[in-house]
Regions:
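Non-globular, low-confidence helical/coil segments that flank catalytic cores
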Residues: 99-110, 118, 123-138, 143-150, ...
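Short, surface-exposed beta-strand/loop "edge" segments at domain boundaries and coil↔beta transitions
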Residues: 32-35, 323-327, 486
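Long, low-complexity, intrinsically disordered segments
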Residues: 485-491
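Short beta-strand element of the conserved SAM-dependent methyltransferase core
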Residues: 24-26, 164-166, 424-425, 432-434, ...
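A short SAM/SAH-binding and catalytic strip from SAM-dependent methyltransferases
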Residues: 82
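His/Asp/Glu-rich metal-coordinating catalytic cores
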Residues: 2-79, 88-262, 266-270, 276-295
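Hard-cation-handling environments
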Residues: 214-336, 343-359, 367, 374-377, ...
């Protein structure tokens, strides 16, 4: 039996050695008319792609285990809030629907709703089974009994990304969602720092996106990525440009397009079906590249069979997963940008074997863009919310452990013990405590829609995704950050 108060449990936000399948439970417990009443919310229900490493075959994804919340009415699950549209925060919902579960109302941005509807269609989820979706925007306030949720815009690599302020009994939590501090975003709202400043004294806890906390400085701004593209194209003086982008990070579609437009390059989009699905989503959202061009350049939604239609100077924006020999014609006049670290080495080798000049994220880290706060972003936020207890999420456990010493040196009041999946904390106004620690559980969604329960286990080096983080490289980055901090302080 839980005492009255606000409780928080990460169900999928901190994998042992990889990140994915994010899901966080907030539960407020109160007494009403001599009865104990629970009100629970979830923030995000993502999927974990490296399901093979969990030891289950014939599968399509792994998802955090929320079955107890869905089956037990006493838990009072009222809603699921969605920070944004990326698969590791959103796609778990579809696998629960495929397995026959009924979900509560969903709250998310309009872009997230469009992506989700596309997923429903792909998995053939019947209309009557699809949960109610309430579109939210920056500044909205929703109440569930005495639990208050305020919506704050967040700058990320997709549209309509949000963080949330959750308040209950004089306890306020800022759940950041994936975000960075960037007010140069194209067609998107920046992180609502103004509102955070207004309520900073009331914020007791920050559940933060520490995905890239091992990067020093401020997260890359979209305007700087745009300028970098332009400068590199001008420097190498190539007339045929190929820009690889990560399919779900639509900000890069737009940044690459605007750079090509600025320099007068005709543009063709080319990729696999996943890439074109996101192009369709952009259209539904209202982003039309032909309209953006205003007849200044030619725009092709798909690569034409006859490349001569593109003219003498053109840029192809596409995914690294769809390449063919059309790109290698007159290779000496081609410049390829590899903006995704994933599989960049193989792609770069293909290009170099054909005599193509390649610039990758290893050469120019700025090219990959960023949707996550760096160390500098969090130091700025710490100055604003200087009374809060900071709770790192969205990163492997070893990153948390390596960050702990650096975080204390930087003045962060970090939660102790650090959060692992399925640990339950009680958040009080002046203190917190670890209430419960259980083994983390995942459900592996199989091809027939059924789900198999399995315990979390170390996954690095196993399955389809061998490594998402380098422990050695992470430690080196933290050592550099720590050295610079100590030097600045004269230690």
């Amino acid at each position: 039996m839980l005492d009255t108060g606000l409780y928080w449990r990460p169900l999928g936000g901190n994998n042992i050695d990889q990140i994915s399948g994010h899901c966080y439970q907030y539960t407020c417990v109160e007494r009403r008319e001599n009865q104990t009443v629970k009100t629970s919310l979830l923030i995000d229900v993502g999927k974990f792609d490296n399901y093979q490493a969990l030891g289950v075959d014939n599968a399509v994804a792994a998802v955090p285990d929320i079955t107890a919340l869905l089956k037990d009415r006493d838990n009072g699950l009222k809603a699921i809030f969605l920070t944004h549209s990326h698969p590791d925060h959103l796609n778990g919902l579809v696998h629960y629907l495929r397995a026959g579960y009924k979900l509560p109302s969903l709250y998310g941005g309009r872009y997230t709703q469009i992506v989700l509807e596309d997923l429903y269609d792909f998995y053939k989820i019947p209309q009557k089974q699809r949960p109610r979706f309430i579109v939210i925007k920056d500044g909205d306030v929703k109440r569930f009994g005495r639990l208050r949720v305020e919506v704050l815009s967040a700058s990320h690599t997709c549209f309509d990304a949000y963080g949330f302020l959750l308040s209950f009994n004089k306890v306020t939590v800022y759940h950041s969602g994936d975000m960075k501090l960037d007010n140069s975003t194209f067609f998107k709202k920046p992180t609502n720092v103004k509102r955070l400043k207004q309520v900073a004294k009331k914020i007791n806890y920050v559940v933060g996106d520490f995905c890239e906390i091992d990067h020093e400085g401020i997260a890359y701004r979209e305007s700087d990525v745009y300028k970098k593209f332009i400068n590199l194209i001008r420097r190498f003086r190539k007339k045929k440009i190929y820009m690889t982008v990560y399919p779900t990070h639509v900000e890069m579609y737009i940044v690459a397009f605007l750079a090509a437009l600025k320099l007068g390059f005709n543009v063709a989009f080319h990729g696999d079906e996943d890439f074109y699905d996101y192009m369709k989503v952009l259209h539904k959202y209202g982003i039309n590249f032909e309209n953006l061009a205003k007849n200044r350049i030619k725009v092709f939604e798909r690569l034409p069979d006859d490349l001569s239609q593109l003219g003498n100077k053109f840029a192809i924006i596409g995914t690294y997963r769809k390449l063919d020999d059309k790109y290698w014609i007159n290779s000496k006049d081609v410049l390829m940008f590899v903006t995704a670290r994933l599989r960049y080495a193989a792609l770069k080798k293909q290009a170099e074997n054909r005599g193509i000049k390649t610039v990758s994220v290893v050469d120019e880290p700025l090219l990959r863009g960023s949707g996550h706060a760096f160390m500098g972003d969090w130091q700025i936020l710490k100055q604003i919310m200087n009374r809060a207890v900071y709770i790192p999420t969205h990163c492997p456990d070893f990153v948390l452990e390596e960050f702990y010493e650096v975080g204390q040196l930087a003045g962060f009041n970090l939660i102790n013990p650090l959060p692992h999946n399925n640990m339950l904390y009680k958040f009080g106004k002046d203190e917190y405590k670890l209430v419960e620690k259980k083994p983390a559980v995942w459900l592996v969604s199989q091809k027939d829609g059924n789900m198999v329960k399995t315990l979390q286990c170390p996954t690095a080096g196993h399955g389809s995704i061998r490594n998402t983080y380098s422990k050695r490289r992470t430690l080196q980055k933290f050592k550099i950050i720590e050295y610079k901090m100590e030097k600045k302080r004269g230690v």
